[in-house]
């Protein structure tokens, strides 16, 4: 329904020093400062985004382009995004407590030399998601481009769409383009395919033996996947796979294993996979494998990672960090929720089909019927603009000092607005009636002393400019 958040920083990537980000025009990211800060995102929800801006070009829920480790990111959620939930194009930003719900593509996507850390990551794909995680690195056909991506993701729960009718086929983690990384304390459940699939590995070493810290820091040229991770697939043979027709060898250095069988969720049924339910509870049970099995210590003693008592995105049987703000909790689709609901939109009078008026109308245009229109700026009409009967145009309020939204028909233009007694055409503020009254003051031509605005002055108005005579100069 809209785009998303895009943060562009100056941390390193493995593409050009600066590159153009997808989804918008001519904005660059990347640089030489791994500690760069793009600010902070804490308890931020991005819902119903990912609008298409061109062929095969959608906007991710939250895009990190060359974002550095000085940026603070925790307790953020993307829900119902058309493309990926969280995508990292290079950079070094570290993240905690992130949830990606019901994406049209991947929950998490790392690429272009991303070297960052993440803990407590939750994905539920629904029936439309492609992968819970797409882990990439290379540039073009060069799978060994440097710096090589090396995400360190620990304590994650990835829930696929299952094998029922309508579920999309795909592995939960797709490891591609020579990426490195460290993955531990994870739960992979309900895939419609493999748990983890390798493709186009380059010279990467794939191992289940975690190298020493000195190797980690100086040469992150390996992909480590802990044998303590749980992959709940139909058979152990389908836990791991190599993509057929891969262009570069994928030869693990070890015999790969993972814990098989159910992780021991408190309550997750196949009927919950499409959109959750009132009883859906992805926390681990005390007697399940997630809590009773061997847990991974923080990799190389890294203080960024918290010690946990259970595997998965929830570090204990009681730590439901989604309960107060997640779409699942606020929509009544999760047990243990404390969120009381999703606040009603202040634009509740708008129709389901809402369109922003253009800044200019230089050719004859007929607005669509059964559409709500938003007037957010001064709109100039130099051709014919026809507004159907019954249409309502809602004007946004603007801060003091900003030009008020107005519809301006310039000389040579025409406004054709033919309503009726039963279907009038209305221009009004987008604000609800209860929000219109204001104690602010302003001056008018007839009253230079301040008057109380009350319900007045919420937007500009209509201005029609023609060619008929006046007693002023020919034009004024």
Regions flagged by a language model, labelled:
Residues 1-369, 374-388, 396-414, 420-476:
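Extracellular beta-rich repeat passengers
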């Amino acid at each position: 329904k809209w785009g998303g958040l895009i943060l562009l920083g100056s941390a390193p990537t493995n593409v050009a020093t600066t590159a153009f980000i997808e989804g918008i025009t001519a904005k660059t990211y990347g640089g030489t400062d791994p500690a760069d800060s793009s600010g902070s995102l804490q308890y931020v929800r991005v819902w119903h985004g990912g609008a298409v801006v061109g062929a095969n070009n959608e906007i991710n829920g939250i895009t990190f382009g060359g974002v550095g480790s000085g940026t603070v990111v925790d307790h953020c959620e993307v829900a119902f995004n058309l493309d990926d939930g969280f995508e990292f194009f290079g950079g070094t930003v570290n993240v905690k407590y992130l949830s990606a719900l019901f994406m049209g593509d991947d929950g998490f996507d790392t690429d272009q030399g991303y070297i960052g850390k993440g803990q407590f990551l939750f994905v539920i794909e629904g029936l439309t998601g492609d992968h819970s995680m797409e882990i990439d690195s290379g540039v073009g056909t060069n799978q060994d481009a440097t710096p090589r991506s090396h995400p360190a993701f620990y304590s994650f729960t990835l829930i696929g769409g299952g094998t029922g009718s309508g579920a999309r086929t795909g592995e939960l983690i797709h490891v591609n383009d020579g990426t490195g990384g460290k993955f531990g304390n994870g739960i992979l459940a309900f895939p419609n395919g493999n748990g983890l699939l390798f493709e186009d590995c380059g010279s990467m070493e794939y191992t289940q033996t975690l190298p020493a810290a000195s190797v980690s820091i100086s040469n992150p040229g390996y992909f480590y996947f802990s044998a303590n991770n749980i992959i709940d697939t139909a058979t152990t043979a389908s836990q791991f796979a190599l993509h057929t027709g891969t262009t570069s060898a994928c030869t693990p250095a070890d015999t790969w294993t993972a814990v098989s069988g159910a992780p021991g969720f408190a309550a997750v049924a196949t009927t919950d996979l499409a959109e959750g339910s009132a009883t859906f509870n992805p926390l681990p049970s005390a007697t399940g494998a997630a809590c009773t099995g061997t847990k991974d210590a923080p990799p190389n003693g890294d203080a960024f990672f918290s010690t946990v008592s259970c595997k998965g995105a929830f570090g204990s049987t009681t730590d439901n960090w989604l309960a107060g703000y997640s779409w699942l909790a606020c929509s009544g689709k999760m047990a243990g929720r404390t969120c009381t609901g999703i606040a009603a939109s202040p634009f509740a009078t708008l129709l389901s089909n809402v369109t922003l008026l253009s800044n200019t109308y230089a050719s004859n245009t007929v607005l669509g019927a059964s559409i709500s229109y938003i007037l957010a700026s001064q709109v100039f009409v130099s051709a014919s603009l026809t507004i159907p009967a019954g249409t309502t145009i809602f004007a946004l309020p603007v801060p003091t000092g900003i030009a008020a939204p107005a519809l301006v028909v310039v000389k040579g233009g025409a406004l054709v607005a033919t309503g009726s007694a039963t279907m009038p055409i209305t221009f009004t503020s987008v604000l609800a009636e209860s929000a219109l009254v204001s104690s602010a003051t302003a001056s008018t031509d007839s009253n230079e002393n301040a008057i109380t605005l009350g319900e007045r002055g919420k937007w500009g108005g209509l201005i029609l400019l023609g060619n008929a005579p006046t007693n002023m100069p020919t034009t004024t």
